[in-house]
Every structure is written in C-alpha cells, then in structure tokens.
Amino acid sequence: MLYRKWGSEKDEVVNYTSSVDSDREIIEEVKLTMKAHVISLYLTGYLGKETARKILVALNEFKEIGQGYEDIHEALEDFLIKKVGEDAGWIGLGRSRNDHVATALRLRLRNKLIELLTDINSLRKILLDKAKEHITTIFPSYTHLQLAQPTTFAHYLTYIEEELASRWEIIFSTLKQVNKSPLGSGAIVGTNVKIDREKEAELLGFDSIIYNTLSATSSRADILSTISELTVLMVVLSRIAEDLIFFSSNKLIKLPDSHVSTSSLMPQKRNPVTMEILRAKAAESIGMLTSLLSIYKGLPTGYNLDLQEMNKYYWLVINYTKSSIGVLSSLFSQIQVNKINIDESSLATDDAELLSISKKVPYRSTYFEIAKKVREGSYKSTLKIEDSINMKAVIGSPNFDLMANLIKIRETKLKEDEKEIEEYKLKIISKLGELQVIENEIGE
C-alpha cells in the first residue's frame, strides 16, 4: 500500500477522486520538482550520491501515468520504488504532495505564460507592420454600431495593438507573482528536514519563495489572478472578433480564405468561422473562471482536494487564449481592406467644429445648425475625407503624420517588451542549467 491504497480500474472511489487526467498536463513539471527535491536531500546530506543517482536516472525514464492511481505523485513514487527499490522511499522525506503539486502548477503556468507573452508580442508586431501599410487607408468608425466619423485602418489596428500591450503588462506582472516557489513547505507547516528552500527555488528558476508554508501549500490566489487576466484578454479578443465579423458582413474587409467556410447549401457564403469560435471560447473562459472562483470561495485555509478540481480549468483557459492569439495572428497577416465609400454625413462633426471656430460662436449653436441640415437632407460638406482625418490635431488620432509617428512609438515599446520577456526567460533557463549541472555531477 502507498498513501491510502493501490486502487484498480474498477475502484469507484479511486476513479472518482483521481486527478490523473488533468495531471498529465504537469508530468514534466512534477518530475522537475522531484529532481529539485532529490538534489536538495543530497546536498543536505540526507541522501547518498548513489541513491540520488539511481532515483534521478529513474525519474528521467518516467513517461506516463498508469490507471488505478490517485494522482501523478502516487504513480511516480510507485514507479521509482519499482525501478530503484526500497531506497526510493527516501523521496518522501520532507516532502508532501501539497507543496509538490503547488510547485508543479506554478512551473507549468510559468512556461505557458512565457509562451503566451511571446505570442502576444508576435501579434502586436503583425498589427504594427500591417498598420504601416494602411496609414492612409480610409475606414469608417462606429459608435452604437452606427457610422460615426472617418478614420483609417491603421487607426483601428493600433487600437488593437495598444489593447494587447496593456494586457501584456498586466499578464507579465501576474507571471512574476506566479514565479515564486512553494517547494519545501511540506503539507502545511514545513518539515523537520533542514531543506534549503531558497536553494530549491533558485534551482527551479523561481524569483523567490512563498515564505509562509500555509500560504505556499493552500493558496491559489496568484493563479486565479492570472486566469482572471487571461479571461479579460479573451473578452478583449472577443470584441475584436465581433468587429471583424461585422466588418466582413458589411464588405469593409475580406477575411483570408483559410478563416472562412462556405455553406452546405448556399455556395456564395463566406462564413467567418474562426471568429465565431473565438467568441465562443471567450464565453467558455468566463464560465471556467466562474467555476474556479466558485470552487475556491468556500474552502477553509489549508489544502483541500477541491483544489485539484480547479487544475483542468487553468490549462483550458490558457490554451484557449494562446490558440486565439495564434488565430488572430494568422488572420491579420492576411487580411484585405476593400475600397470604401464613406457617407459624407460622417463629416458633420468636422463642419460643426470648423464653423464654431471660424464664426467664434459656441459649438452647440453650430452643432444644431448642422444637425438641422442633416435632418432636412440639405447637408453638403465642402471637406474631403482625407482633409477630415488630417485636420485632427491630437496624439493618437488617425492624422496621417501623427499616425506614422505613433506607430514608431508603439514599435519602440514593443521592442522593450520583447527584450524584457526574453531576458526573463533566459534568467530562468540559466538557473535551470545549474540544476542540470548538479544532476550531471551526481551521475558521474
């Protein structure tokens, strides 16, 4: 028997409480966590070099979780005992599933977030490159889904890029919160074994440790903050998807062929299927975040098995977010803008403003004067669409020159963000390299 008991595929209790399916997501991270623990026991003198070597060799051979186990931790320990023998039981010294799963979750989420942040930057670059092509491409803007004022497609694209940049900064800050080590905290109050928690954290590439062992083993608040921000990002992406569906339906843009499908009956149809799926995945993400918060809200402090039911939702939300960023990268790299004739009523605001300035009368007076002409059907503007855009005098407007300068500013910010995430990633890799060096030394 190990922990509670060995189960079987027919054991209803084991099957009911088992987390094996969701644990497959963290196999490599659980192994890495165990390596750090074994090395820590070796460095502090609790484990002999030969025993440590055998365990580390066996760890590298573990590939899959069999059936009949409560979780990956039970499966891994059973595997090690069968491979190494009784000496593998030393891994239980100073270790709990509680601190090990908390560590593995953070390692996995860290890797996923670094990948996602890199992907977001790739999409931002695509948007800025495309914006440079469309600085003078006339495009309508809308409020209440009604025609508002003339803008450019570059103006729309840089709006998306800045939204993504804002989300990027917040998600990067959650990454820093996630990248703290719970390892060495035991089940709840630590352990009598003199484990160097800070050394373990360093070997695993963490920035620091979570000091309080109760918090380290039972808190999921940092992860929930991350999933919350990813869900906000998905909501932002869903709005963009809705825009693209609307623009496509109104013949303002042509979506890439790879992002549309036709009807089984109507051969002329170009259905925006990828954007429809993105909207649905955003809704699912909201539902999964709600499930996570609902599970977590009533738990007493300390580890409870309810926490394992949260794990599957972490990976679903982050995988949905990553795939959605990838789909939008593909779409925007190929999107085409159609030639658009914008109704001249969209120039009414410009005429009212110019009239107020030239006559030196309150804007509300000229507003009503222009509005009356629009209602009567007698409104005619003397402006061209391009004039309307280039008269805009504020930073962030679609004015051609100001937009060209804004794109340069945004490109500089993107390069800074690219450098920041790359340096952060390399710092982690460097620390993990030290763990590998020690493992190699033990294996000699």
UniProtKB/Swiss-Prot annotation:
Pathway listed: Amino-acid biosynthesis; L-arginine biosynthesis; L-arginine from L-ornithine and carbamoyl phosphate: step 3/3
One Gene Ontology term of the molecular function aspect: argininosuccinate lyase activity
Reactions that this protein is recorded to catalyse: 2-(N(omega)-L-arginino)succinate = fumarate + L-arginine
InterPro entries to which the protein is assigned, alphabetical: Argininosuccinate_lyase (IPR009049), Fumarase/histidase_N (IPR024083), Fumarate_lyase_fam (IPR000362), Fumarate_lyase_N (IPR022761), L-Aspartase-like (IPR008948)
Recorded GO CC terms: cytosol
Documented EC number(s): 4.3.2.1
Annotated localization: Cytoplasm
Pfam families: Lyase_1 (PF00206)
GO biological process: arginine biosynthetic process via ornithine; L-arginine biosynthetic process
Keywords: Amino-acid biosynthesis, Arginine biosynthesis, Cytoplasm, Lyase
Family to which the UniProt record says this protein belongs: Belongs to the lyase 1 family. Argininosuccinate lyase subfamily.
PANTHER family membership: ARGININOSUCCINATE LYASE
Entry protein name: Argininosuccinate lyase
